[in-house]
């Protein structure tokens, strides 16, 4: 588990949450903005060929973040994650992207689609699309890309570590329920469907 030096203390809490020990979840100091994610060469040599699956989930998904910070994390971070995965001779690189890579595409954007993306005017859309392109162009490493829509809390407990995205919409719905009579049907159109995925 790649961890910034300032976040090492959080790993114990994650181990406890996952029911794992220190051998099962190993904290590796690194930094998304550094070459090979800042992982020490000695660690890479020691673990080369021993890692079957490399999961890259790190990104900035704050729609208000600057274009520069999104590019640094989402594009360059992905590029360096691939460099590290190749140095480790990883079996398969897994990228958790976002449906934002589709831009403002109208309709259903399937797993096989990429070039068909709609307008990529927002830095988040642009950087998620570009980072996927970097992975898709990779020839030396097997890879898989996952595009969740809006990620919400656990499907059973509702637990979530960050309130953003759809949670603001849920608050609006709660407010609306106080003024709209119970049982009153609301007109909705098909374009209003949302892809919401529980974190688990």
PLM regions with names:
Residues 66, 157, 166-197:
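A conserved pocket-lining segment of Rossmann-fold NAD(P)-dependent short-chain dehydrogenase/reductase
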Residues 71-75, 120-132, 163, 192-196:
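Short-chain dehydrogenase/reductase
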Residues 53-57, 64-72, 76-123, 143-144:
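Conserved Rossmann-fold NAD(P)-dependent oxidoreductase catalytic core, especially the SDR/UDP-sugar
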């Amino acid at each position: 588990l790649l961890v910034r030096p300032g976040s090492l203390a959080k790993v114990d809490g994650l181990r406890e949450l996952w029911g794992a020990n220190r051998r099962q979840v190993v904290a590796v100091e690194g930094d998304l903005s550094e070459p090979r994610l800042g992982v020490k060469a000695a660690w890479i040599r020691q673990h080369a060929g021993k890692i079957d699956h490399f999961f890259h989930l790190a990104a900035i998904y704050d729609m208000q973040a600057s274009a520069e910070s999104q590019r640094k994390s989402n594009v360059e971070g992905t590029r360096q994650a691939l460099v590290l995965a190749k140095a480790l001779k990883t079996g398969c690189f897994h990228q958790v992207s976002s449906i934002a890579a589709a831009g403002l595409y109208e309709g259903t954007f399937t797993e096989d689609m990429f070039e068909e993306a709609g307008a990529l005017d927002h830095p988040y859309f642009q950087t998620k699309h570009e980072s996927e392109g970097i992975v898709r162009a990779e020839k030396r490493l097997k890879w898989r890309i996952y595009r969740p829509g809006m990620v919400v809390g656990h499907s059973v407990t509702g637990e979530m570590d960050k309130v953003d995205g759809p949670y603001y919409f849920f608050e609006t719905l709660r407010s609306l329920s106080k003024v709209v009579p119970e049982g009153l049907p609301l007109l909705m159109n098909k374009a209003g469907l949302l892809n919401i995925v529980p974190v688990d």
